[in-house]
C-alpha cells in the first residue's frame, strides 16, 4: 500500500500558519464593542472628530492588551502601556512640529533604542515599548488640530475607558460570588485541573507536556494573585481564601511532578482529589471527601499529605453546612484514620513544615523577591536588552527615514508598522512579515468594499465598533489581528476627515515589510541570540539556586516552593524565546542552535531536583537513582552549553 504523501514545512512557515485555540472570550468581545465605537460616536455627535480618533486609538491599543486574567492584573497590563503611549504622543507631536526630517529621525531612532531595550524585561514592558513607538510616530505624522498634551489626554481617556469596563463588567457566571476576583478564581482552579492532568498522564508520553501546562497555569495564577494593589497584604476574606488555596496547590504540584518524574502510571483515582478541589474553587462550596492515594512510595505519601492539607485549608475558608467538616480526615475516602505518619503530620497544623510553608506563602507573597531597579537595569543593559534595542532602533529609524524621504501624507504608517514587525518577543520576524502583509491586504480590501456602500460617518462608526469587538478573537493569529486593526484604523482615518486610503495602506505596509526583512537580517554588533542566551543564563541560575537549597537540607518549604516556581518560570521564558528564535529564517536561527537541548536538560534537572526534595522529605536521604541522575544531567549540561557556545554553568552547580 503506498504511503500517504506529506510535505514537511520549514519552521518559519509552520509558525506563520499556527493559530491559538480556545473558547471565544465573550466578555472581552463585549468590552471591545463598548470601547472604541461609543467613544468615537460621542465625539462625532459633539463635532470633535479628531478627539474621537485619539480616544478610539487609545481604546484599540488597550484592547490588544486586554487578555484573560484578574482585574488587578488588567489594570497593570493595560494602564502601563497606555501611559507609555501617551508619553510617545507628546514627544512625537512636539518633535514633529519643531524639528526637521533628520533630527526627527534621530529622535525616533533613540526612542526605538530605549523602547526595544526596555521590552526585554517582560510582556508588560514590551507592550509599553510598542505603544510608545507607535504613538510617537502617530504624534509626529498625523495632522490633528489638538496640541500634544491634549492628544495624550484623549488617548489616555480611551485606554482608561476600557479599564473601567474591565473593572465594572462581571464575567458570565461571576455574580454568584465576589466578581472582583473571578479572574483569580478561574486561575487557581485551573492550577488544580492541571495537577490532575499531570497525575493522569504520569507514566505516559504526555507527561512532559502536562508538566509544562502545569507550569503555565501556576505562572498565570501567580501573576493574577500578585497583581498591583493599594495595600501590601490581602484585604478581603475572599482574596485571602484564594491565596491560601493557591498556596495549598504548591505541595500538590510538587508531589505530582515527582510522581511524573518516577515514570510509573498511577491509578485513575489519584487525579480525582485535585479535580474535586478545582470544582470547589470555582463554586465556593466544600470540596467533599477526597479519594486518598495508597501511601506506598514517597511521592504518593507526599501527595496524600498535600491533599489532607488542602482539604483542611478549603474547610477553613469554604462554606460550612454544619456537622462534620467535608474533606476532614474522617471522610477521606479509603483512608484509615489511624495512619501514624499522617496523624503525626496533622497533629499540629501550625507547626508542621507543610502547613507553615503554606501560611508563609499565602501571607508574605507569592514571589521569591520583587523586581529591583538594579535587576531591571541589568536586563535592559544586558546582552538581550542591547540586541533587542539595536534591532528595533535600526528598523524603526530606517522606516522613519524612508517614509519622510517619500513625502507621503501618511508617512507615519511606515515606522508604526515596523514596530509591530520587528519586536522579537512578539514572534519570528519572517512569520510576522508574512502575516502582516496578508492581513493588511485582506483588511484593506474588506474596508474598501464597506467604504463604498456604508453611509458616513455613522457607517464608519459602526465599523469601528464591530472591529473593536473582533480584536479579542483576532489576537489568536497575527494576520487576523492585522486585518481587523487595518479596517479599524482606515475607518478612523476617514472619520478624521482624510480621504479613503486602502491602497496606500497596502503599499506602505509592503514597503515596511521589505525594510524590516532587509534591516532585520543585517549583521549586528556583538553576538546574535543575546536574548535567548540571557534567558538561558537566568534559567541556569534559578535551577542552581533551587538545587542548592534542596541539597542543603533546609526545611523552609516556602523558600523551596518559591525557588521552584522561579526555576520553572525562567525555564518557560527561555523555552518560549528559543522556540521563537528557531522559527526565524536559517540566517538568524543558526545563532541559537543547540539552545533547545540546554533548556530540555535544565527542565529535566529541575524535575529531578523536585523528586529529590520529595524523597528527602520522606526518608532524609537520596537513592542512588537520584544521585546518578543528577550527576548525569550536570555532565550533559556542561557538554551542551559548550556546543551551544554558552558560558560554563556556575562552578558550585557542578559540585552540587
Regions found by a protein language model. Give the residues of each.
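Cytosolic regulatory and coupling regions of membrane transport/channel systems
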Residues: 1-30, 34-37, 162, 166-409, ...
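Alpha-helical transmembrane segments and their membrane-interface boundaries
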Residues: 1-132, 136-163, 296-325, 329, ...
Amino acid at each position: 500500500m503506498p504511503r500517504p504523501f506529506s510535505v514537511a514545512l520549514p519552521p518559519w512557515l509552520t509558525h506563520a500558519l499556527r493559530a491559538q485555540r480556545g473558547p471565544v472570550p465573550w466578555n472581552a468581545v463585549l468590552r471591545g464593542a463598548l470601547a472604541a465605537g461609543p467613544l468615537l460616536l460621542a465625539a462625532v455627535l459633539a463635532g470633535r472628530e479628531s478627539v474621537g480618533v485619539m480616544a478610539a486609538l487609545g481604546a484599540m491599543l488597550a484592547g490588544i492588551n486586554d487578555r484573560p486574567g484578574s482585574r488587578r492584573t488588567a489594570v497593570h497590563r493595560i494602564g502601563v502601556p497606555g501611559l507609555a503611549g501617551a508619553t510617545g504622543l507628546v514627544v512625537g507631536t512636539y518633535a514633529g512640529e519643531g524639528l526637521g526630517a533628520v533630527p526627527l529621525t534621530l529622535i525616533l531612532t533613540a526612542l526605538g533604542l530605549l523602547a526595544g531595550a526596555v521590552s526585554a524585561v517582560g510582556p508588560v514592558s514590551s507592550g509599553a515599548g510598542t505603544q510608545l513607538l507607535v504613538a510617537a510616530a502617530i504624534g509626529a505624522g498625523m495632522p490633528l488640530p489638538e496640541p500634544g498634551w491634549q492628544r495624550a489626554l484623549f488617548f489616555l481617556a480611551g485606554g482608561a475607558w476600557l479599564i473601567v469596563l474591565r473593572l465594572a463588567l462581571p464575567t458570565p457566571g461571576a455574580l454568584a460570588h465576589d466578581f472582583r476576583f473571578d479572574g483569580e478564581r478561574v486561575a487557581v482552579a485551573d492550577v488544580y485541573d492541571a495537577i490532575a492532568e499531570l497525575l493522569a498522564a504520569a507514566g505516559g508520553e504526555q507527561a512532559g507536556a502536562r508538566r509544562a501546562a502545569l507550569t503555565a497555569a501556576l505562572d498565570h495564577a501567580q501573576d493574577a494573585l500578585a497583581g498591583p494593589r493599594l495595600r501590601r497584604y490581602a484585604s478581603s476574606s475572599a482574596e485571602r481564601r484564594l491565596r491560601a488555596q493557591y498556596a495549598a496547590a504548591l505541595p500538590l504540584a510538587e508531589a505530582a511532578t515527582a510522581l511524573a518524574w518516577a515514570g510509573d502510571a498511577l491509578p485513575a483515582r489519584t487525579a480525582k482529589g485535585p479535580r474535586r478541589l478545582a470544582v470547589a474553587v470555582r463554586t465556593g462550596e466544600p470540596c467533599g471527601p477526597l479519594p486518598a492515594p495508597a501511601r506506598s512510595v514517597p511521592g504518593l505519601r507526599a501527595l496524600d499529605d498535600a491533599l489532607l492539607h488542602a482539604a483542611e485549608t478549603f474547610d477553613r475558608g469554604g462554606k460550612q453546612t454544619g456537622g462534620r467538616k467535608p474533606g476532614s480526615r474522617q471522610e477521606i475516602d479509603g483512608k484509615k484514620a489511624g495512619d501514624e505518619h499522617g496523624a503525626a503530620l496533622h497533629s499540629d497544623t501550625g507547626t508542621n513544615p507543610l502547613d507553615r510553608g503554606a501560611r508563609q506563602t499565602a501571607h508574605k507573597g507569592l514571589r521569591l523577591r520583587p523586581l529591583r531597579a538594579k535587576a531591571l537595569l541589568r536586563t535592559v543593559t544586558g546582552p538581550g536588552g542591547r540586541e533587542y534595542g539595536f534591532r528595533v532602533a535600526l528598523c524603526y529609524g530606517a522606516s522613519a527615514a524612508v517614509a519622510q524621504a517619500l513625502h507621503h501624507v501618511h508617512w507615519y504608517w511606515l515606522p508604526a508598522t515596523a514596530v509591530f514587525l520587528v519586536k522579537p518577543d512578539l514572534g519570528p520576524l519572517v512569520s510576522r512579515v508574512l502575516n502582516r502583509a496578508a492581513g493588511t491586504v485582506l483588511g484593506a480590501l474588506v474596508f474598501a468594499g464597506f467604504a463604498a456602500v456604508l453611509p458616513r460617518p455613522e457607517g464608519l462608526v459602526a465599523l469601528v465598533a464591530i472591529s473593536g469587538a473582533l480584536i479579542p478573537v483576532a489576537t489568536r493569529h497575527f494576520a487576523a489581528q492585522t486585518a481587523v486593526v487595518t479596517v479599524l484604523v482606515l475607518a478612523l482615518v476617514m472619520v478624521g476627515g482624510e480621504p479613503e486610503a486602502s491602497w496606500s495602506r497596502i503599499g506602505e505596509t509592503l514597503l515596511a515589510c521589505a525594510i524590516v526583512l532587509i534591516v532585520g537580517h543585517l549583521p549586528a554588533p556583538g553576538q546574535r541570540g543575546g536574548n535567548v542566551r540571557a534567558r538561558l543564563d537566568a534559567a541556569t541560575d534559578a535551577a542552581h539556586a533551587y538545587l542548592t537549597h534542596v541539597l542543603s537540607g533546609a526545611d523552609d518549604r516556602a523558600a523551596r516552593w518559591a525557588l521552584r516556581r522561579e526555576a520553572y518560570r525562567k525555564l518557560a521564558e527561555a523555552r518560549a524565546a528559543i522556540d521563537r528564535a528557531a522559527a526565524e529564517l536559517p540566517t538568524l536561527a543558526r545563532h541559537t542552535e543547540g539552545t533547545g537541548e540546554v533548556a530540555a536538560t535544565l527542565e529535566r534537572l529541575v524535575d529531578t531536583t523536585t523528586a529529590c526534595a520529595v524523597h528527602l522529605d520522606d526518608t532524609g536521604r537520596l537513592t542512588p537513582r537520584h544521585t546518578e541522575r543528577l550527576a548525569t544531567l550536570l555532565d550533559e549540561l556542561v557538554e551542551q552549553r559548550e556546543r551551544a557556545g554558552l558560558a560554563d554553568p556556575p562552578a558550585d552547580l557542578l559540585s552540587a
